[in-house]
Every structure is written in structure tokens, then in C-alpha cells.
Amino acid sequence: MAVFKTLTDADIAMFSTSLVAGVDEVGRGPLVGDVVTAAVILDPNRPILGLNDSKKLTEKRREALFDEICEKALSFHVGRASPAEIDELNILHATMLAMQRAVSGLKLTPALVLVDGNRSPAFTHQGLSLASHSIIKGDGLIASISAASIIAKVTRDREMDALDAAYPQYGFAKHKGYPTKAHFEAIAEHGVFDQYRKSFKPVKALLER
């Protein structure tokens, strides 16, 4: 697992001449559901204004940008790892796996993959090994990573809304599966089901009672 913190001048020059995929994740901390990642290759000829870290945008703005990214991006793909995979691999390795799935699902082969954070897995696409860099706070610095953060965030939030409709007693639409007081009270009263991450301490403690 490679760790990169700076880009060379040659890397930066590559941005304007080659396809670059931005990758980000959402959902490492929640107690329930998949960890969701996205890979996005933007079209330099169709700029998208207002891209930023998805957490710094309002829900309304994220939704609008989600639609614009889907329309204008050269390629994007969502990758995920299930609660069972998270329990088997741990959340870090499951997140890396989900990122690899997002990149491998792109319809175009990027010359470079830029990942938000301080770690990057090894990426391949159609049998080719890809160069990659991780960039701390990249979701606020690199447009393609910002776009990936928005795609991943909106996708997972919609999935939590759907889970809320199926299990309204848990309040997923509000806390999105994160370990809030209201969520702890809900699982204490109603228990957990198969979408919960059984290796996470609060869930594991409940199951061991």
C-alpha cells in the first residue's frame, strides 16, 4: 500500500495532457451499510463550477452537483465493500478494495489515479497497472476528487434513506448510520440486522451481551 504526500512537477504537468481519475470514499465510520467509494474522470472541456469537499456542501448543492457530474464526466463508477467484507478484512482494507473496484469499473483507462487521504492501494484497469498518488485533503484541492466525494456521499446518503424507509425505527435518514446517541438507543431497543458491521465495537458489544 503506497503512501504519497506530494506531487512532482511532472505529475502536475500530466494533469493537462492525460486522463486523471479522482477517488474518494464515504462511510468508514458508520455502524451499518457498505463503505462506498467513487472514481471520476472529469472532462476538461466541460468544467463544473463549485466542486468542493462534499462535507462542506449543503445537501441541495450536493444533489445538484451529483446530477451535473453524472452528465458531464467522461466516466465515473461507484465501488463498495459490504458489511461482511468489512468484518472479514477490517475497515481500512475494505475501503481500499472498494476504491480498487471503483477504478476498475471505469469505462476509460486513466493515466493517473488521485486518492483523497494518505494511503492509496495498487490500482489496475483492464490488466494495466496504474500510477497513483494520495493527497491529504484532496477532496478540497483536486476537482476530480471533489467530484468523487460528491458521487460517493450522495450515493450512500440515498441508500441510508432507503434503509430508513425499510427500518424507520432506527432513524437512518437522520444519522446515516453513524454512532450517535439516538442510534445507540435504537439498536439497544431494536437490536441489529444483517446490514450492521458486526466487528465494530458497539455492535459487537451488543451481540455479546
Swiss-Prot record:
One Pfam family from the UniProt entry?
RNase_HII
Q: What is its EC number?
A: 3.1.26.4
Q: Name one GO biological process term.
A: DNA replication, removal of RNA primer
Please name the PROSITE patterns in this protein's record.
RNASE_H_2
Matching CDD domains: RNase_HII_bacteria_HII_like
Q: Which reaction does it catalyse?
A: Endonucleolytic cleavage to 5'-phosphomonoester
Question: Which GO terms label this protein's molecular function in UniProt?
Answer: manganese ion binding; RNA binding; RNA-DNA hybrid ribonuclease activity
Q: What does this protein do?
A: Endonuclease that specifically degrades the RNA of RNA-DNA hybrids.
Q: What is this protein called?
A: Ribonuclease HII
